[in-house]
Curated annotation (Swiss-Prot):
It is found in: Cytoplasm. It comes from Bacillus pumilus (strain SAFR-032). Belongs to the class-II aminoacyl-tRNA synthetase family. ProS type 1 subfamily. It is an enzyme of class 6 (ligase). This is Proline--tRNA ligase. Its main location: cytoplasm. The keyword Protein biosynthesis applies. GO terms for cellular component: cytosol. Coiled coil: none annotated. GO terms for molecular function: aminoacyl-tRNA deacylase activity; ATP binding; catalytic activity, acting on a protein; proline-tRNA ligase activity; transferase activity.
């Protein structure tokens, strides 16, 4: 492609609203432009990268036995109402009405649509397993779109769905997809880790996320420093290694005056105790009920673990007004001892072994000391309810936990019968009995993967595209189009390289050499070939973007040199 004929609007200045490096570079290098908040144009270079990513994905999907189709973006509300997600998905679901008043949504995902399709066509176990996928635009009304393509309101996604007659069949497809995803992210050049994850609004049980390691990532990965264990911090099990409390050590419960002392740090300082000796009591609203969650003062409550424990659709921290109404005191003085409110109390495992601890007295300006949960608190269940911390023992027993930031680029789920039961998607088994289909779903963020690649592959000059996804193989520069020797050599090489099967971006613009070099580094194609002052001798400069190495090569040896590089 001649650069004079395509559309690559490069910029020298960093956009003021671009926080992430990938956002800055994709805008500056002429890959994307914002249409409105969270919605972007994919310009020709970005479109080519996306096509390369999609090609890699399609090959891996075919190897995994998945067939491609294309489903509607506009989805009728009735299907979402059948699954129940119309009422629980939240404001991120873009809803609308047609001229007749019928309700629709712009699909953030396609579980309902694919389940509706398959239930109408697949009636027998003989048609299972079946795996279908699409590459489609998705929509999510993000409250705060940010980081360019990493968190947008419109994005490109590959989503696959599998249907099975047995858990064993689902396991087999899940493992194939896990392998396919690992292959995809390796081939596109990402440094990634598969991690144990929470299924969130998707439902289901077993799930893994594929995280591209990056400081701009919004997710925290907890991983072992000596084993392969890795999990999203929301799901990482915090192992309890403490001992049981000894009643012989219990002191008499005492209420003490603690004026205006509301936080854990304040109460620890006021009473001259370590925060680990304080009991943190946090009231949550779980759907329409309230639960009191207890952790040690130096730990943080994991709301995802709370949600999974109580089986609620929505878990939120209770507001000050709700705490006053339910408990009868300010949040800073809430505690589990002599609690009159009829709420279930759940406690983290570390609380069970606490001895002579401090807790709120459910009265303004007062706390209890010498609180012993085994004696003084009626706990419904002790379980893991805290966020794991760096330095904790790894859940697999090997090594200690370290943290890293990651960008979620893919996720695989075992949905089970979550959607097939609610939407009555059944098949007849060998005995002629109707059974709910067992489902899996598998997503890759195509546009997010594009940004993640740039986050990991760049330097101070611009993007450094991995060969597998680069928009072009080569960047051919005629440094001075007014020089006949340079122009003629560049034109000859352009035709020859194209005939040899290379995808070439030919900079034939009437620009200064410095501008062409700067744009070439910014765009980041793997190899640059410059026709300059030695063009009359048949000598060109070949420069490799990743290593920065440059070589003077004769045009007769150019093709073999590039192929061997």
């Amino acid at each position: 492609m001649r650069q004079s004929l395509t559309f690559i609007p490069t910029l020298r200045e960093v956009p003021a609203d671009a926080e992430a490096k990938s956002h800055q570079l994709l805008v500056r290098a002429g890959f994307i432009r914002q249409n409105t908040s969270g919605i972007y144009h994919y310009l020709p270079l970005a479109h080519k990268v996306i096509q390369h990513i999609q090609s890699i994905v399609r090959k891996e999907m075919e190897k995994a036995g998945a067939a491609e189709l294309l489903m509607p973006v506009l989805q009728q509300a009735e299907m979402w109402q059948e699954s129940g997600r119309w009422y629980t998905y939240g404001p991120e679901l873009m809803r609308m009405k047609d001229r007749h008043g019928r309700e629709f949504a712009l699909g953030p995902t396609h579980e309902e649509v694919i389940t509706s399709l398959v239930r109408s066509e697949v009636k027998s176990y003989k048609k299972l397993p079946l795996t279908l996928y699409q590459i489609q635009s998705k929509f999510r009304d993000e409250q705060r779109p940010r980081f360019g393509l990493l968190r947008g309101r419109e994005f490109i996604m590959k989503d696959a769905y599998s249907f099975h007659s047995s858990p064993e069949s689902l396991d087999d497809t899940y493992n194939k997809m896990f392998t396919a995803y690992s292959n995809v992210f390796s081939k596109v050049g990402l440094n990634f880790r598969p991690v144990i994850a929470d299924s969130g609004a998707m439902g289901g049980k077993d799930t893994h996320e594929f995280m591209a390691l990056s400081e701009v990532g919004e997710d925290t990965i907890a991983y072992s420093d000596t084993s392969s264990y890795a999990a999203n911090i929301e799901m990482a099990e915090a192992v309890y290694q403490g001992e049981e409390a000894n009643p012989a050590d219990f002191k008499e419960l005492e209420k003490v005056h603690t004026p205006q002392v509301k936080t854990i740090q304040d109460i620890a300082g006021f009473l001259d105790v370590d925060p680990s000796l304080c009991i943190k009591s946090v009231l949550f609203k779980a759907d329409d009920a309230y639960v009191l969650i207890l952790t040690r003062g130096d730990h943080e409550v994991n709301d995802v673990k709370v949600k999974n424990l109580v089986g609620a659709q929505l878990v939120e921290l209770a507001t000050r007004e709700e705490v006053l109404e339910v408990i009868g005191t300010e949040p800073g003085f809430v505690g589990p001892v002599k609690l009159e409110a009829e709420v279930d109390i759940y406690a983290d495992l570390t609380v069970k072994g606490m001895t002579n601890a401090v807790a709120g007295a459910n009265e303004a300006d007062y706390h209890y000391v010498n609180v012993n949960p085994a004696r003084d608190v009626s706990v419904k269940e002790f379980t893991d309810l805290r966020f794991i911390q760096e330095g904790d023992v790894s859940p697999d027993g090997e090594g200690t936990i370290q943290f890293a930031k990651g960008i979620e680029v893919g996720q695989v789920f075992k949905l089970g019968t979550r959607y097939s039961e609610s939407m009555d998607a059944t098949y007849l088994d060998e005995n002629g009995r109707a059974q709910p289909m067992i489902m899996g779903c598998y997503g890759i963020g195509i546009s997010r993967t594009l940004s993640a690649i740039v986050e990991q592959h760049h330097d101070e000059k611009g993007i450094i595209w991995p060969e597998a996804v680069a928009p072009y193989d080569l960047h051919l520069l005629a440094l001075n189009m007014k020089n006949d020797a340079q122009k003629e050599l560049a034109e000859t090489l352009y035709e020859r390289l194209e005939n040899e099967g290379f995808d070439v971006l030919f900079d034939d613009r009437q620009e200064r050499a410095g501008v062409k070099f700067a744009d070439s580094d910014l765009i980041g194609l793997p190899i640059r070939i410059s026709c300059g002052k030695r063009s009359e001798e048949g000598i060109v400069e070949v420069k490799f973007r990743k290593s920065g190495e440059s070589h003077e090569v004769s045009v007769d040896e150019l093709i073999s040199f590039i192929r061997q590089a």
